[in-house]
């Protein structure tokens, strides 16, 4: 058994053990409410974590940069602007009118529409200059974030507290209907990703090498940006913004696999994301008693590990 297979199997076993602990710790074996509710949250963790991991790894392959995530393109900022506008014009009753499912659908559709605008406006003009695409995405992110902050100033304190809750990663908002839809879409995309994974290996070599091997960037860049947009739309609408968690998750996966092949990196990245989310959720529920958020804990856990492996790599130079 190779060390790569061993690492993946260990991560899968860790996911299983953490899932069992998450479901049954302090549950009282309540099959009517507690355990079903935790199963829903566990499903959200698995789906959301997989979306975050896959989108981050694919985006870094396209950008040829391991310190960036899709959030730099402004996808999550659109979500925040929408939530702020909903509270500004409709108030707290807006969430009640739309409901969790309605908000999920509208948020996902808006993110996808924004991604299509990016593709037709930016990618068609600058598809041969990825740095220009990233720069425009960064500027759009700053503009949209500023718009969201401007709207926050105009809403009431009660509405602001609701907005703050929506701006953090949370698994409490998941519903069976949204999970079914998100899981179906993720499964379909996973099948396509499995067929395209050899292309990612070539893309990871660089644009010139990819073109010399027969890959046209005019074809694969829009395709993969569409996949990324769908994954980000699902994860953001389902569990909220994840900001730069994907940076830590993807880089930890690279360090564990030590392989340039994405058929190894993608599954490991998914298991790492699930482990991080499960660990953070367990700590939020049973250690911090909901006095902190999953986002903070995941950034601390992943950031700490990422710093350690960076220092180790530096010391080996």
Swiss-Prot record:
Pfam families: FecCD. GO terms for cellular component: plasma membrane. Keywords: Cell inner membrane, Cell membrane, Ion transport, Iron, Iron transport, Membrane, Plasmid, Transmembrane, Transmembrane helix, Transport. GO terms for biological process: siderophore-dependent iron import into cell. It comes from the Bacteria. It is found in: Cell inner membrane. Disruption phenotype: Mutants cannot transport ferric-anguibactin and are unable to grow under iron-limiting conditions. The chain crosses the membrane at residues 10-30, 39-59, 72-92, 98-118, 133-153, 177-197, 228-248, 268-288, 291-311. Disulfide bonds: none annotated. It is a multi-pass membrane protein. InterPro entries: ABC_BtuC-like, ABC_transptr_permease_BtuC. GO terms for molecular function: transmembrane transporter activity. Part of an iron transport system composed of the outer membrane receptor FatA, the periplasmic binding protein FatB and the inner membrane proteins FatC and FatD. Belongs to the binding-protein-dependent transport system permease family. FecCD subfamily. PANTHER family: FERRIC ENTEROBACTIN TRANSPORT SYSTEM PERMEASE PROTEIN, PETROBACTIN IMPORT SYSTEM PERMEASE PROTEIN YCLO. Involved in the uptake of iron in complex with the siderophore anguibactin. Responsible for the translocation of ferric-anguibactin across the cytoplasmic membrane. This is Ferric-anguibactin transport system permease protein FatC. It comes from Vibrio anguillarum (strain ATCC 68554 / 775). The gene is fatC.
